[in-house]
C-alpha cells in the first residue's frame, strides 16, 4: 500500500451538457468522476463545490466514511445531494485504483466477465426510420436495441387507443426486422397509468421484449408490482432512484425483474454495488442507466465487470463529437460489447483539449397535453 496522501482540491467542470469532476491529491494522483442528471448539472456543481470544503485535507482512501459524513450532514436529500456524492464517490474509487495500480473492479471483488453486453438506443420519427435505425444497430453488432415505440407527439393529439395501437405496430415492425438476431427493449418513459400499463403490456407480450421499462411512474412500488404481476413481460425501472432505500422498497414489493441504477445519481459505485447485492438476493438483474458522458460509461463498466447479476448496459454511442473527443483512449467497443479495461482506476484519462469546449446545458422542458395539462417527461 502506498503512503497515504491528502486531498488537495476538487475541480468541477461543466462540459457540454455534463458535469465532470476531478479530485486532486497532494501526491499528484487525480481521480475522475461524473454526477447529476440532465438539466440539473449546475445545482449539482454547487453541491460538489460545497462538499469540497469538507474533503480538502482528508485521506481519499476513506471512501465510505466520506460518503456517510456528507450524506448524513446534508439533512435534506435529493438528486442534487446524491448527484454530487455520486461524482465524488466515483472519483475517490478512481484515485484508489490508480494509487494501487489496479482497476476498480479488482477492489470490489474481482472481475466476473471480460466484456459487457450493451443495448443501443435506436429511434426515428416514422416507423420506417425506427426500423432502419434498429437494423443499422444490429448490422454494427449489437444484440439488443432499445426504443420508445411512438413518435414525440403521441400524447398531444391522439386517443390512448390510437397511440397504443401505434406502439404495438412499431414494436412488431422492429421485432420482424431484427428477428432472432437481437433482443428488443421497450421504453415507455412513465407515460401511462397502471391499468394502461397492464393493457399495453399484455398486447406486447407476443413480441417477447427483453424488458418493459417504466410503463408508469416508479414512485409506487405496490402499483408497479401489480403491473409486473399482470404482464408476462419483465419490468425494468429505478433510474430515478437516489438511495438504496428506494431500491429496497422496490425489491421487497417484487415490482421489477431488472433494476436500473444510475451511478451518477444513486451514490456512485459504492451504492450501486450495494444495490446490486440487494437485487442478487431477489434474483433480480442489473441494467445500469447511462445517458451521460463516457465517464459515466467507464464507471458503469467497472460495476458491470464485478457483479454476478449483470444483464445489459445502456449505451447511447460515443463515436461522434462531443463524446468521441472526451477521452484520450476511448473504451473499446466490439460487436456490441464494451471490453473491460485493464488500466488502473476507471481506466480512462480526460482529453484536456476537449475540456476547453463550451457548456451546452440541457434546457428543462416537459410536454403539454392536448388539453393544456402538464405531462410527465
Q: PLM ranges: what are they?
A:
Residues 89-125, 129:
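Glycine-rich, aromatic-flanked loop segments that form ligand/cofactor-binding clefts
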Amino acid at each position: 500500500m502506498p503512503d497515504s496522501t491528502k486531498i488537495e482540491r476538487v475541480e468541477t467542470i461543466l462540459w457540454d451538457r455534463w458535469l465532470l469532476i476531478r479530485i486532486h491529491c497532494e501526491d499528484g494522483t487525480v481521480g475522475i468522476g461524473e454526477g447529476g442528471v440532465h438539466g440539473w448539472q449546475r445545482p449539482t456543481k454547487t453541491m460538489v463545490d460545497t462538499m469540497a470544503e469538507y474533503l480538502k485535507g482528508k485521506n481519499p482512501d476513506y471512501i465510505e466514511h466520506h460518503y456517510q459524513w456528507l450524506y448524513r450532514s446534508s439533512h435534506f436529500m435529493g438528486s442534487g445531494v446524491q448527484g454530487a456524492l455520486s461524482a465524488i464517490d466515483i472519483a475517490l474509487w478512481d484515485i484508489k485504483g490508480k494509487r494501487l495500480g489496479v482497476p476498480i473492479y479488482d477492489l470490489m471483488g474481482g472481475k466476473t466477465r471480460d466484456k459487457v453486453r450493451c443495448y443501443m438506443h435506436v429511434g426515428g420519427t416514422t416507423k420506417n426510420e425506427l426500423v432502419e435505425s434498429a437494423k443499422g444497430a444490429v448490422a454494427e453488432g449489437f444484440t439488443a436495441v432499445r426504443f420508445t415505440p411512438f413518435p414525440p407527439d403521441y400524447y398531444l393529439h391522439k386517443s390512448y387507443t390510437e397511440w397504443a395501437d401505434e406502439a404495438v405496430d412499431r414494436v412488431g415492425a422492429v421485432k420482424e426486422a431484427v428477428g432472432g438476431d437481437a433482443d428488443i427493449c421497450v421504453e415507455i418513459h412513465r407515460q401511462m397509468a397502471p391499468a394502461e400499463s397492464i393493457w399495453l403490456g399484455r398486447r406486447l407480450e407476443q413480441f417477447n421484449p427483453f424488458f418493459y421499462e417504466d410503463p408508469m411512474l416508479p414512485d409506487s412500488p405496490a402499483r408497479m408490482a401489480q403491473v409486473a404481476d399482470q404482464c408476462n413481460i419483465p419490468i425494468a425501472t429505478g433510474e430515478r432512484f437516489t438511495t438504496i432505500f428506494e431500491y429496497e422498497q422496490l425489491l421487497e414489493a417484487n415490482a421489477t425483474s431488472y433494476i436500473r441504477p444510475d451511478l451518477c445519481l444513486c451514490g456512485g459505485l459504492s451504492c450501486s454495488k450495494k444495490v446490486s447485492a440487494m437485487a442478487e438476493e431477489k434474483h433480480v438483474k442489473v441494467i445500469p442507466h447511462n445517458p451521460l458522458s463516457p465517464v459515466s460509461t467507464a464507471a458503469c463498466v467497472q460495476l458491470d465487470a464485478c457483479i454476478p447479476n449483470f444483464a445489459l448496459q445502456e449505451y447511447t454511442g460515443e463515436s461522434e463529437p462531443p463524446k468521441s473527443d472526451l477521452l484520450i483512449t476511448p473504451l473499446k467497443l466490439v460487436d456490441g460489447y464494451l471490453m473491460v479495461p485493464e488500466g488502473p482506476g476507471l481506466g480512462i484519462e480526460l482529453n484536456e483539449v476537449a475540456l476547453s469546449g463550451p457548456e451546452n446545458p440541457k434546457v428543462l422542458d416537459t410536454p403539454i397535453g392536448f388539453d393544456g395539462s402538464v405531462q410527465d417527461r
